[in-house]
């Protein structure tokens, strides 16, 4: 009978010291707390924050761009080829516009009353 009484005292001791009842092994977000009452309020608050942060972490999947999500499917080569083709097309159009502008300046197609000092020509 003395053993049963001693076990009950050991189980109630953390509650008498002002500590909260926690699962054995620490559980999620466990931090050891001191026995004084001043640290218990901060411990409880931090425990809640840690649990909240862990619950929110899986919700960040929406922030991953689709290109990265599809990388595992073997579509990298196609995406890169499409990107390179777009870059070649942009460069071609840019060279065409620059050449057209330079030809207009050099051939004097602009009206004579315009001042050409502020214009420039980039030769490809």
UniProtKB/Swiss-Prot annotation:
Cited InterPro entries: BEX, TF_A-like/BEX
Record note on modification: Ubiquitinated. Degraded by the proteasome.
Annotated phenotype, changing residue 121 to S: Abolished zinc-binding and association with FEM1B
One term of GO molecular function: metal ion binding
List of residues binding Zn(2+): 121
Chain positions covered by the region annotation Interaction with 14-3-3 epsilon: 81-124
Result of altering residue 94 to A: Abolishes nuclear export and interactions with itself and p75NTR/NGFR
Compartments in which it is found: Nucleus; Cytoplasm, Cytosol
Chain residue ranges for the region called Disordered: 1-56
Motif Nuclear export signal: positions: 90-100
Consequence the record notes for mutating residue 121 to A: Abolishes localization with replicating mitochondria
Outcome after substituting residue 99 to A: Abolishes nuclear export and interactions with itself and p75NTR/NGFR
Entry text on domains: The nuclear export signal is required for export from the nucleus and the interactions with itself and NGFR/p75NTR. The histidine cluster (His cluster) and Cys-121 mediate zinc-binding.
Subunit composition and interactions: Self-associates. Binds to the DEATH domain of p75NTR/NGFR. Interacts with 14-3-3 epsilon (YWHAE). Interacts with DIABLO/SMAC.
Family indicated by similarity: Belongs to the BEX family.
Annotated protein name in UniProt: Protein BEX3
Protein species of origin: Mus musculus (Mouse)
């Amino acid at each position: 009978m003395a053993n049963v009484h001693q076990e009950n005292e050991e189980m109630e001791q953390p509650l008498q010291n002002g500590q909260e009842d926690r699962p054995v092994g620490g559980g999620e977000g466990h931090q050891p707390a001191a026995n004084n009452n001043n640290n218990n309020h901060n411990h409880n608050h931090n425990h809640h924050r840690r649990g909240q942060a862990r619950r929110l972490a899986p919700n960040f999947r929406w922030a991953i761009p689709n290109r990265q999500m599809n990388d595992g499917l073997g579509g990298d080569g196609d995406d890169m080829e499409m990107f390179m083709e777009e870059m070649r097309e942009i460069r071609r159009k840019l060279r065409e516009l620059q050449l057209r502008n330079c030809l207009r300046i050099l051939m004097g197609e602009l009206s004579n009353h315009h001042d050409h000092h502020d214009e420039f020509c980039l030769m490809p």
